């Protein structure tokens, strides 16, 4: 069996107004090579962008990989490592029996994560972590670029 490639992924989401124009930023490192990705949406939320960033990064991988995925979003990290198990058992309902917010993205993240061996890590935002700061710059620039793309899953109450 061949050993899986080790990819370091850093992600961040940004939203101006929350809801408002938003964007995500991604930095991917593999064997000294760096790839950056970002995109923006006309109307979305910070949490949706924090979820979309790792989705896009994981979906960009062309084969199963060992991934160290670092984000400053406790919402995303706690959701994918802890809360999601209960949500799935309860038919995507919370412990309060209300529908899980951003369920379209949670399902997509869950599916993308199944293909890889992921170590989900958290880093404090705006604390000088170089890759996280770069992701923040990419996400903010995407949000500030007057994006017109529609976030199809965004609902005003999410």
Curated annotation (Swiss-Prot):
Keywords: Cytoplasm, Endonuclease, Hydrolase, Magnesium, Metal-binding, Nuclease. The gene is rnhA. GO terms for cellular component: cytoplasm. It is found in: Cytoplasm. Mg(2+) 2 binds at residues 12, 136. CDD domains: RNase_HI_prokaryote_like. This is Ribonuclease H. Transmembrane segments: none annotated. GO terms for biological process: DNA replication, removal of RNA primer. Belongs to the RNase H family. Binds 1 Mg(2+) ion per subunit. May bind a second metal ion at a regulatory site, or after substrate binding. Endonuclease that specifically degrades the RNA of RNA-DNA hybrids. Its EC number is 3.1.26.4. InterPro entries: RNase_H, RNaseH-like_sf, RNaseH_domain, RNaseH_sf, RNaseHI. One of its GO terms (molecular function) is nucleic acid binding. Monomer. Pfam families: RNase_H (PF00075). It is an enzyme of class 3 (hydrolase). Its cofactor is Mg(2+). Residues 3-144 form the RNase H type-1 domain. It catalyses: Endonucleolytic cleavage to 5'-phosphomonoester. It comes from Shewanella sp. (strain MR-7). Mg(2+) 1 binds at residues 12, 50, 72. Coiled coil: none annotated. Gene3D superfamilies: Ribonuclease H-like superfamily/Ribonuclease H. It comes from the Bacteria.
